[in-house]
Amino acid sequence: MPDRFVKNPVASIAARLKNEATALGLTPAQLQVMPLQMAYAHQGFLGRLDLSPHAERFVLKGGASLFARYRDLGRPTRDLDLAAQGPPATPEEVAGWIREICAQPFGDHLLFPPEEVQVRSVAPESAAHPVVNVRLTAHLGTSRQPVELDVSFGNVIHPGACLLEYPRLVIPEAVRLRAYPLEQVVAEKFAAMVELNVANTRMKDFHDLWQIARHDPPSPLPGESARGMPARELGEAMARSFQVRGTPLADLPFLLGEDFATDPAVTGNWARYRKKNAWARLPDFRDVMGVIRAFPGVVATTLPERMTGSWDPTALRWR
């Protein structure tokens, strides 16, 4: 029924969101991490971005891009990661872009007051990958939903951004926007693992690679393989990411070895993450590293040569 015939559209949206959770297959535990009101606010911001003059400036990356691909199989995320194209910008410039996006009409009964946008620099413009943190608020009637963005610069996207369809919540048509290719997601997360080594506290990256290795996206995007990630494209994405980031390949054997998989600091972090995310039914860290070793690890150890074949998520090996 069109909203103009609904006496209280805001109340109607809240009720319909509960039905959407069932349709997406999201569990109560997942909704504790990312409530539907938050997902609706994410959709509202991304929809405004899609309609704004800044649509070509940003590419969705991180957990939100995986949630859009894998739906209930994905990891719920509380923030949005955006890769900004072009040279690094000041926090004030980023704030100006975001305020213009917030002012874009979208028709979902959400309001993003531009005057509530707050920004701060997480990594300075002089860094290899400057990052600006953005905080804003989505208003739905009298309710308030904080939204947090991380806008990063200096990202090399290979083989190029692809068109992603965000899971549709209540609105008639899904939001379509540019997103990281899956090979790039794997390459950057794996590069960060090599760089951080035992100091790594980003357990969500291990979770993501374990999940990507075990499942093809239910709805692959245009240009993405429906039957396994191509080894050659992953190798090219890795080579570019390693070069741009200055990833120390000398540390690669340790990351892929037994000492890392059993390191007390890392396994302790994983145990806490695993308990907090019990809904995902994650295995022991050694098992996770076994999958990562077989998936991006094999490709990384062949560089600069390029492997052929594709990844089999059922057999957990390259074919």
Functional labels for PLM-detected ranges:
Residues L60-A64:
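Glycine-rich beta-strand-to-loop/alpha-helix junction loops that act as flexible
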Residues M1-F58, A68-L80, A84-R319:
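Structured mid-to-C-terminal alpha-helical surface segments
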